[in-house]
């Protein structure tokens, strides 16, 4: 008769195997075996560990999986605990519509994932009903739209940089101060004429330079572009309220960049009688640097005394040259 070997410390020990049930099946078994078809979370843990030794000796990581399935699956319903009963934690029970989710009562096979139809309609229905009136009120044609009646608060189109020239400065003046504008059609050059009687300038009228003519007074060629000629500082336009005499306004015509020969300009500059009390001319009327000498006829008529704003006379340079139709200072 052979003796069987005694089990020693080196003999292999049998480890419990994992049961072939899903976590949903384990929770359903624990709930159905509990009194009242409801169990707390700790009661579900005790049932699983008491029936399956694998979960009793295994690490407690499976408990997190139990809580995860209780929260995500709609077949488990959380019922609050009654305040009159001792204990803590809510109860978990099965939804009445999911008792047949296992085929033939076997927890090994589950029919399909349970979806609570009534709860889904109850939760989604009010949301759609709330969205409906909001969409209807926003698209109601009877309600005036606040954005359509709002006027544009931005200023109109700004003038181009060309408007900063002398011509644009005159155009920016009010209608009461703006002189009569000329059309943009080119005009033939005016021939110099000798007229004995000057044409008096009204206080509200100011000379306007034509942009189409060249600038022979400064020796510019006829092809000199308008943009290059207007890059200089523009001559300030004086308002009629400034009290400037008519003779001084006519003298300002000689300082414009592009001008035709005024018939009465020569006679006005030849007169030695100054204006009674004109204001101080602006600083931009100072004499520029002398230009290269040309075949010109010097005309010395003495300085033009202009009464300054502080009461002292202000004289212009006496070096005034004359060409066959132009006058300018050097």
Curated annotation (Swiss-Prot):
<dbReference type="InterPro" id="IPR001766">
    <property type="entry name" value="Fork_head_dom"/>
</dbReference>
<protein>
    <recommendedName>
        <fullName>Forkhead box protein S1</fullName>
    </recommendedName>
</protein>
<dbReference type="InterPro" id="IPR050211">
    <property type="entry name" value="FOX_domain-containing"/>
</dbReference>
<dbReference type="InterPro" id="IPR047364">
    <property type="entry name" value="FH_FOXS1"/>
</dbReference>
<dbReference type="GO" id="GO:0050885">
    <property type="term" value="P:neuromuscular process controlling balance"/>
</dbReference>
<dbReference type="InterPro" id="IPR018122">
    <property type="entry name" value="TF_fork_head_CS_1"/>
</dbReference>
<dbReference type="InterPro" id="IPR036388">
    <property type="entry name" value="WH-like_DNA-bd_sf"/>
</dbReference>
<feature type="DNA-binding region" description="Fork-head">
    <location>
        <begin position="17"/>
        <end position="108"/>
    </location>
</feature>
<keyword id="KW-0539">Nucleus</keyword>
<dbReference type="Pfam" id="PF00250">
    <property type="entry name" value="Forkhead"/>
</dbReference>
<dbReference type="GO" id="GO:0001227">
    <property type="term" value="F:DNA-binding transcription repressor activity, RNA polymerase II-specific"/>
</dbReference>
<dbReference type="GO" id="GO:0043433">
    <property type="term" value="P:negative regulation of DNA-binding transcription factor activity"/>
</dbReference>
<feature type="region of interest" description="Disordered">
    <location>
        <begin position="111"/>
        <end position="157"/>
    </location>
</feature>
<dbReference type="GO" id="GO:0030154">
    <property type="term" value="P:cell differentiation"/>
</dbReference>
<dbReference type="GO" id="GO:0000785">
    <property type="term" value="C:chromatin"/>
</dbReference>
<feature type="compositionally biased region" description="Polar residues">
    <location>
        <begin position="136"/>
        <end position="151"/>
    </location>
</feature>
<dbReference type="InterPro" id="IPR030456">
    <property type="entry name" value="TF_fork_head_CS_2"/>
</dbReference>
<dbReference type="GO" id="GO:0045892">
    <property type="term" value="P:negative regulation of DNA-templated transcription"/>
</dbReference>
<keyword id="KW-0805">Transcription regulation</keyword>
<comment type="function">
    <text>Transcriptional repressor that suppresses transcription from the FASLG, FOXO3 and FOXO4 promoters. May have a role in the organization of the testicular vasculature.</text>
</comment>
<dbReference type="GO" id="GO:0003700">
    <property type="term" value="F:DNA-binding transcription factor activity"/>
</dbReference>
<dbReference type="GO" id="GO:0001568">
    <property type="term" value="P:blood vessel development"/>
</dbReference>
<dbReference type="GO" id="GO:0000981">
    <property type="term" value="F:DNA-binding transcription factor activity, RNA polymerase II-specific"/>
</dbReference>
<keyword id="KW-0678">Repressor</keyword>
<dbReference type="GO" id="GO:0006357">
    <property type="term" value="P:regulation of transcription by RNA polymerase II"/>
</dbReference>
<dbReference type="GO" id="GO:0003677">
    <property type="term" value="F:DNA binding"/>
</dbReference>
<dbReference type="GO" id="GO:0005634">
    <property type="term" value="C:nucleus"/>
</dbReference>
<dbReference type="GO" id="GO:0040018">
    <property type="term" value="P:positive regulation of multicellular organism growth"/>
</dbReference>
<dbReference type="InterPro" id="IPR036390">
    <property type="entry name" value="WH_DNA-bd_sf"/>
</dbReference>
<feature type="compositionally biased region" description="Basic and acidic residues">
    <location>
        <begin position="184"/>
        <end position="196"/>
    </location>
</feature>
<dbReference type="GO" id="GO:0000978">
    <property type="term" value="F:RNA polymerase II cis-regulatory region sequence-specific DNA binding"/>
</dbReference>
<dbReference type="GO" id="GO:0009653">
    <property type="term" value="P:anatomical structure morphogenesis"/>
</dbReference>
<keyword id="KW-0238">DNA-binding</keyword>
<feature type="region of interest" description="Disordered">
    <location>
        <begin position="179"/>
        <end position="200"/>
    </location>
</feature>
<keyword id="KW-0804">Transcription</keyword>
